[in-house]
Amino acid sequence: MNNVDYDLLIVGGGMVGASLACALDGQDLRIGLIEAAPLTVSAHPGYDDRTLALAQGTRRIFQTLDLWETLAATATPIRQIHISERGSPGFAHLDCRDEGVEALGYVAEARLIGAALLAKLPTLRNVELLCPARLETVRIEPDAACIDVRFADERTVE
């Protein structure tokens, strides 16, 4: 078993884990990203053909991560939102023009978001991709947390 020290381990290379890894690029941290599936869009269950509504805050995060330019080409702007309940006289209507923004949010395919994130991961300077691999055990010791990782080829690291 090989011993490797990381400042931070991210378990899961889905949208949240991959976004976190991208956001921490350039920090003075040695980061490992553990993912059970191969890091390809077709292999990852989270990067499927579902469409997701992205808030303006998410767009700003993707912009900061230098991903929005790639996603903007296929994302559909949400310009109006109508909220009502069947049988109830009340409703709410939101319009991007009233808010002074280009869009209230965007609709994008999970597969395309995944493709943008996965294309960026190998370029990160301080993130080591540990995949396909799975977290085996976690032990808390006085000065560190020890984690055993098993790769698909049965190699292990601690």
Report the location of each language-model feature.
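Conserved N-terminal helical subregion
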Residues: V4-D5, T74-E158
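N-terminal Rossmann-like FAD-binding beta1-loop-alpha1 element of flavoenzymes
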Residues: V4-L33
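Anionic group-transfer/hydrolysis microenvironments
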Residues: L9, A37, R111
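N-terminal FAD cofactor-binding segment of flavoenzymes
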Residues: G46-R86
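Short glycine-rich hinge loops at helix-strand junctions in the catalytic core
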Residues: D28, D66, N126
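Glycine-rich FAD pyrophosphate-binding loop
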Residues: D25-R50
